[in-house]
């Protein structure tokens, strides 16, 4: 009985460890900030990449958590917020993770980001992990606060 209980507990720990390691961060050179917040995740990055770049990459399936970070470069390439949002949904659908997260900018940053974030907050399938960012100046992402800027695309991607 004790041996069976030990095996069950060991199995739970292995399952939790595997789930933590079954996360993938994709994006540009800024992915290091997310890596700080999600230390067990694997990383794929290409400097200067946009969400459109990742749409053309062969997807990796069976991922529990997919974190997408391309917003800065999408803005540099003048991709409109609505297009960026719809492309992130396409990317989530193509890669089929259990949970899909995208890094979102703070509210009081560049005006394009403000407009973009406000548009996203109205989407029914977006859940913010933390919107209490009013005290941040928005000009710099501190590496230990990246986790505050995720939004999660849920269900209907």
Feature map (PLM): residue ranges:
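Serine-esterase "nucleophile elbow" of acetyl-processing enzymes
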Residues: 18-65
């Amino acid at each position: 009985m004790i041996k069976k209980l030990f095996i069950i507990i060991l199995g739970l720990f292995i399952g939790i460890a595997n789930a933590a390691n079954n996360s993938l961060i994709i994006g540009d050179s800024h992915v290091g900030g997310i890596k700080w917040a999600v230390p067990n995740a694997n990383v794929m990055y290409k400097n200067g990449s946009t969400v459109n770049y990742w749409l053309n990459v062969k997807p990796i399936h069976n991922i529990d958590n997919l974190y997408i970070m391309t917003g800065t470069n999408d803005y540099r390439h003048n991709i409109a917020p609505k297009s960026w949002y719809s492309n992130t949904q396409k990317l989530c659908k193509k890669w089929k993770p259990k949970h899909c997260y995208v890094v979102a900018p703070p509210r009081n940053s560049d005006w394009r980001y403000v407009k973009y974030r406000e548009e996203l907050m109205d989407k029914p399938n977006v859940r913010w992990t933390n919107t209490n960012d009013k005290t941040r100046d928005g000009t710099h992402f501190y590496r230990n606060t990246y986790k505050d800027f995720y939004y999660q695309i849920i269900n209907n991607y």
